Amino acid sequence: MVHQFSADMIRSSTTQHSRREAFRFIGAVAGSAVVSAIGFQRSGLAQQSFTSSEAPNFPDGAVIRTLQGDINPTELANGATLFHEHVGRADVDLAVEELRASAFDGLGCIVDAATGRRSPEQVRNLEAIAARTAVRIIMAGGYFEDIGFAIYPVRVAEMTEDALVEELVTDAKSQRWGAFGEIASSLEMRPDERKVHRAVARAHLLTGLPIFTHTPHESCPSCAMEQLDVIEGQGVDLSRVVIGHMATIKPEHRPLTTHTEVARRGAFVGLDTLGHEMGRSRIPASDKVRMVLDLIDAGFEDHILLSSDQGNVNQFKVNWGHGWSSVLMQFVPKLRFAGVPEELIRKLLVDNPRRFLAFVPTG
């Protein structure tokens, strides 16, 4: 029965009805060999031939700040960009080899999320990795607290909001950050977390750097709204913000309701736990495909960002995993099988992330 489904049949499934039929089939076979075969037919560099779409409009003077230098956003037209990953956790040599392998799969740019203030060693390691790979590396920074997972150092909890703003701006300039992130909060946002979110929002206004957040993996729709409220309360244009871990919202919490509200307010919906199941959420791939399809059907394709939040060496290619190719080699083939056309896949992997990351430097 599996072999009765051809790639041509799948690519012709462009209506909502046929896409849903394809999606139901994915759920029935739980990511069977059909999906793998389709992905294999388009694997390697040919998988991401990003040449068929016109570039988005970018503001005059906009750049994307990478460790290899500031670049024009048009320079990220021919490779996928992952907006939320963890590169600096790996050994330098291993990270370089993994990135080179993922470049063959179509990766062009990767954002390294911070889970605390950057140490000099972290900065040196990321700079060394960037010098040895053609994949553009963007260093992000900030402060991270999600009770039960990580808490702020005492110094951050004791600092004033003004002092945090000054430190964020100073570190962003001296370490060449290209974004603030991942900025985290707990299931119930604590006063110190509100202080940090306000400080990051104010630092954004002083630098122009975009912001991406972390919401708890335990499924927390209200956390997304709290983060937006605090950040917007400081005067931030929410089109410069990604609310992260939106793929961890469980079906019983009606993820589409949260996703559409985030998008209606102007922010990006960060579906950034793709290609694997996070230990604290266990959302299957079929549910994550449904999230993408539902957002597209609701008219919010311009607000979707994809990533894997990958930094676990056990899941690297050297250990028979997909590493930073998880989105490209595991998740994108499922989108194709579900009927998502190539021009939309390009938008999700190329155009949306560079619209988010492009900024006009200020200050």
What is each stretch, according to the model?
Residues 18-38:
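N-terminal export leaders
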Residues 214, 271-273, 300-321:
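Short acidic/histidine-rich active-site segments
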Residues 128-131, 136-210, 261, 268, ...:
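Active-site gating/metal-coordination segments in enzymes
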Residues 70-83, 88-114, 119-136, 160-176:
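Alpha-helical scaffold segments that flank or form the walls of functional sites
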Residues 37-67:
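C-terminal segment of N-terminal export signals and the immediately downstream linker at the start
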Residues 173-253:
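Divalent metal-binding pocket/active-site signature
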Residues 91, 123, 149, 221-228, ...:
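Histidine/acidic-residue-rich catalytic or RNA/ligand-binding cores of hydrolases
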Residues 1-18, 45:
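N-terminal secretory signal peptides
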